[in-house]
Amino acid sequence: MGTARFLRAVLLLSVLLMVTFPALLSAEHHDGRVDICRLPSGSGDCLRFFEMWYFDGTTCTKFVYGGYGGNDNRFPTEKACMKRCAKA
């Protein structure tokens, strides 16, 4: 039973890495800096409820943030999101 649980955890971790790692790489500039506007939305790890905004590649979209974790593609207002991420 312990081996099956371990293998299941390894498989889950592998899938999460395969999904997350390419998204992080595509958000990286050539000089190694991360463009926060290209990161996926990150709801965070807690169960609190904060309405925030993230840039989805074209526009700013509202999402629920849990209050801890996530990433820097998170803004308190649509205006702040557009100011940082919208291209003129």
Curated annotation (Swiss-Prot):
What sequence ranges are listed for the domain BPTI/Kunitz inhibitor?
37-85
Site described as May bind Kv1, located at 39
Lineage: superkingdom: Eukaryota
Q: In which tissues is it expressed?
A: Expressed by the venom gland.
PROSITE patterns in alphabetical order: BPTI_KUNITZ_2
| Any one GO BP annotation for this protein | envenomation resulting in negative regulation of voltage-gated potassium channel activity in another organism
Single Gene Ontology MF annotation: potassium channel regulator activity
- Pro-peptide positions? 28-33
Main location class: secreted
Q: Where is this site: Reactive bond for chymotrypsin?
A: 47-48
Alphabetically ordered keywords of this record: Disulfide bond, Protease inhibitor, Secreted, Serine protease inhibitor, Signal
KW Secreted (keyword) present: yes
Where is the protein found, in the record's own terms? Secreted
Annotated GO CC locations: extracellular region
Spans through the membrane: none
Q: Which SUPFAM superfamilies match?
A: BPTI-like (SSF57362)
Please list which residues make up the signal peptide: 1-27
State if Secreted is listed as a keyword.
Answer: yes
Q: Which InterPro entries match?
A: Kunitz_BPTI, Kunitz_BPTI_sf, Serpin_venom_toxin
Disulfide bridges in this chain: 37-85, 60-81
Q: What does this protein do?
A: Serine protease inhibitor that inhibits trypsin at a molar ratio of 1:1.
Q: Which family does it belong to?
A: Belongs to the venom Kunitz-type family. 03 (sub-Kunitz) subfamily.
- Which PANTHER family does this entry report, sorted A to Z? EPPIN, WAP FOUR-DISULFIDE CORE DOMAIN PROTEIN 6A
What is the recorded name of this protein? Kunitz-type U15-theraphotoxin-Hhn1h
